[in-house]
């Protein structure tokens, strides 16, 4: 299947976090591609990836990065596709540096920013699916079912309080 979501990350060390976005897309049967695209080590490749994403059929890009975390913003600067930034937790500042770098974009270059780490990657996968579901009723139904299942799990969790 043609990938609809591009998942990019600054290095392989970001995979521990970013795989959770892939898990969500797998669960919802949304096709995606995943690549290491470094804003600092492979800037030309990053520009090419962003500039050609639309013509390759990509509809949403999820970009995960830690530290300076320039990947989401620089990707957004080179495409008008929706870009979702995932701050990867860093050792130095627990991901706060990544979060602030991604969320503080100048007006005119939006990046939808999620929370730090695993929860952020999960939410990025869900947000990408929700964006696509605006044009895909089957995907919208799957998201509704997932939300209902989550609700039931929470309601049933009270039974564990013994």
Swiss-Prot record:
- Which ranges form a coiled coil? none
Q: Which InterPro entries match?
A: PurE_ClassI, PurE_dom, PurE_prokaryotes
Organism listed in the record: Bacillus subtilis (strain 168)
Could you tell me the keywords of this UniProt record?
Isomerase, Purine biosynthesis
KW Magnesium (keyword) present? no
What name is this protein filed under?
A: N5-carboxyaminoimidazole ribonucleotide mutase
**Signal sequence annotation:** none
Q: Which gene encodes it?
A: purE
EC number(s): the record gives 5.4.99.18
Q: One Pfam family for this entry, by name?
A: AIRC
Name the family. Belongs to the AIR carboxylase family. Class I subfamily.
Top-rank EC class of the record's enzyme = isomerase
Q: Which GO terms describe its biological process?
A: 'de novo' IMP biosynthetic process
Function, as annotated, reads: Catalyzes the conversion of N5-carboxyaminoimidazole ribonucleotide (N5-CAIR) to 4-carboxy-5-aminoimidazole ribonucleotide (CAIR).
Task: Provide the catalytic activity annotation.
Answer: 5-carboxyamino-1-(5-phospho-D-ribosyl)imidazole + H(+) = 5-amino-1-(5-phospho-D-ribosyl)imidazole-4-carboxylate
One annotated GO molecular function is: 5-(carboxyamino)imidazole ribonucleotide mutase activity
Q: List ligand-binding residues for substrate.
A: 11, 14, 41
Q: Which cysteines are joined by disulfide bonds?
A: none
According to its UniProt record, in which pathway does this protein act? Purine metabolism; IMP biosynthesis via de novo pathway; 5-amino-1-(5-phospho-D-ribosyl)imidazole-4-carboxylate from 5-amino-1-(5-phospho-D-ribosyl)imidazole (N5-CAIR route): step 2/2
């Amino acid at each position: 299947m043609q990938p609809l979501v591009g998942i990019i990350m600054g290095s392989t060390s970001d995979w521990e976090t970013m795989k959770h976005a892939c898990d969500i897309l797998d669960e919802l049967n949304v096709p995606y591609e995943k690549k290491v695209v470094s804003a600092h080590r492979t800037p030309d490749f990053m520009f090419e990836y962003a500039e050609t994403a639309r013509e390759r059929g990509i509809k949403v890009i999820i970009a995960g990065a830690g530290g300076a975390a320039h990947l989401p913003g620089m990707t957004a600067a080179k495409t008008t596709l929706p870009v979702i930034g995932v701050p990867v937790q860093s050792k130095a500042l627990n991901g706060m540096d990544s979060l602030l770098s991604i969320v503080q974009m100048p007006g005119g270059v939006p990046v939808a920013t999620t929370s730090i780490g695993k929860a952020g990657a999960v939410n990025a996968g869900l947000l990408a699916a929700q964006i696509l579901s605006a044009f895909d009723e089957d995907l919208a139904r799957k998201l509704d079912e997932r939300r209902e299942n989550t609700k039931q799990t929470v309601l049933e969790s009270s039974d564990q309080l013994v």
